[in-house]
Amino acid sequence: VGVLKALAELLPKGTPNPFGIISGTSAGAVNSIVLASKARRFKMAAAELERVWAAFRCHHVYRTDHLTMLKSSLHWMVAIVFGGLAGGLPRSLLDNAPLRSLLSRNVRFPRIETALEQGWLEAVAVTAAGYGSARSVAFFEAAERHSEWSRTRRIGRATRLNLDHVMASVAVPMIFPQVQIDGEYYGDGAMRQATPLSPAVHLGAERILVIGIRDETADPAPDRLHPDSYPSFGQIAGYMLDTLFMDGLYSDMERLTRVNQLLDSVPPDLDRGEFSGMRPIDTMLIVPSEDLRVVAERYRGELPFAIRALLRGVGGQPEGPSRLLSFLLFERAYTQELIRLGYRDAMRVKDQLLAFATGEPVPRLFAPEWIRRDLNSLGG
């Protein structure tokens, strides 16, 4: 959101949405839908996103009252002890009905169709993972008749987007309830999404602005003199979610960079043969200059007591940066800090960002130096 705020300030007043194609997964799906529904006025859309995220509290996203948390804990305990024979199996650890209510009040889905008809938007896609089919499904709505696509374990499906698609995309496994769409249950779009850039590419994007949520500096490895303690359930769950959300993007960017290098190596006057239907795609990547887990740790005390107790119960690292914490922390002090961080990082590259958004000539790949070095290396 901070990056979008910076771009809104850089663009002239009254500028419509600069992104013809918008694609998002998980929390990015929420931002994508808001941008698409307010595509006529980009500054207004960015301001609306900032207003909502800056005012977030955990109870706006999931129920945090003691009674609900007690019922959920007891339900899980009974299900484990009796194998689901008493009271049925729990659907999730937390209930995110408040988020559904918040989105239903703030997002007008019919405005997406209007934006498409008026030419303010070309297409918008929201990705979710199907549990029955074991596929990553990009639900998209487009101005023109875009062909649906089918690849190994991933498809693109044309539809009229609604709240269920967004709630499915944010349904973090085990934490939030899964959502049924057309007879199949769907969960967080990051699952099975090995190619997160794919929806934008299939929908015709020639430039892709990627807003990452973590830098790729490696965590320090433990040594024999200071070995790690045995990982708790919370640490393992946090690691699984961290992998789920982080790893696909950089692998996909590496593939895209290699394809670009291959296409750029062919002289324009020569036949590209089997690659004739492919096109190079400019990419700009903006990532946080600070580890969000470290930022989250500074605001651990902002969590409601019931959620802090839950984290302690599952061993979610009472001290030190926690992967699981950053997935549950939706308090305004933390989200405001994230907005400020994104804004600062975007303004550091404001000239390149503005050029990228307005169609000016840009490098094929713009990213932090250490990422650019890795992506540009063909050494594997």
Please place each PLM-identified region on the residue numbering:
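Alpha-helical membrane-targeting segments
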Residues: 61-94, 98, 228-229, 233, ...
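Active-site gating loop/helix substructures
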Residues: 117-244, 320-329
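Extended hydrophobic secondary-structure segments that form protein cores and membrane-embedded regions
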Residues: 20-26, 123-128, 283-287
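Patatin-like phospholipase
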Residues: 1-93, 97, 101-103, 141-155, ...
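Glycine-rich, charged/polar anion/phosphate-binding loops
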Residues: 110-111, 192-197, 262-273
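Active-site periphery "cap/insert" segments of enzyme catalytic domains
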Residues: 90-128, 137
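Short helix-terminating capping/connector loops at secondary-structure junctions
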Residues: 14-18, 115-122, 275-280
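C-terminal helical/tail subdomains of lipid-metabolizing enzymes
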Residues: 90, 103, 263-380
